Design a protein with these regions (language model features):
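Feature detects amphipathic, helix-rich regulatory segments
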Residues: 1-171
């Protein structure tokens, strides 16, 4: 497949691009040749699809938003929900929990790198609250994750070489 890599074209989502609740691409993300991507159009991701790590940090998931729409994920586990029953952000939030990751690791295979088999992924049973509750849970967990991220970034923002040594925070 590497012969179809390009500097521009259809974005390729790799397992390493998927972080908890978000996609973090390298400075130069991999793109695919448009003709090759068109031949594989059934793999194109749509807004609201949940993309889950298949190899590596298995179980980690994020939701496709506008900037990733149309991308392709070949080596990822891709889930499209019926949004009248299951909020994709709730599903991704659940996939990122310790409970789900413990399950994923307990059924993983591989020699050195963990693999989450589709067969085991499809056996997963999830308790699904009402859509309203799913929305509230997703919003709350996302807000907590933003606060955690900001606290993790604080040392980089509070007077070090990254910002020229200026003290930006009171300590």
């Amino acid at each position: 497949m590497t012969e179809n890599y390009r500097d521009s074209g259809t974005l390729l989502i790799r397992n390493s691009d998927i972080k908890e609740g978000q996609f973090l691409f390298s400075e130069n993300p991999i793109h695919l040749d448009e003709e090759f991507a068109e031949k594989n159009k059934t793999r194109r991701l749509q807004i609201g699809d949940v993309v889950t790590v298949h190899t590596g940090d298995i179980g980690t998931s994020a939701v496709i938003e506008e900037k990733e729409a149309g991308a392709i994920g070949f080596a990822t586990i891709n889930t499209r929900t019926d949004k009248s029953i299951l909020n994709p952000y709730f599903l991704a939030t659940y996939f990122n929990t310790e409970k789900h990751k413990c399950y994923a690791n307990s059924v993983s295979t591989g020699d050195g790198r963990s693999n989450y088999n589709i067969k085991d992924f499809n056996k997963l049973v999830i308790s699904v609250p009402t859509l309203d509750e799913q929305e509230r849970i997703s919003v709350l967990i996302n807000a907590i994750n933003i606060i955690i991220t900001l606290h993790q970034q604080e040392p980089f923002l509070c007077g070090n070489s990254v910002n020229g040594g200026r003290k930006l925070c009171s300590q």
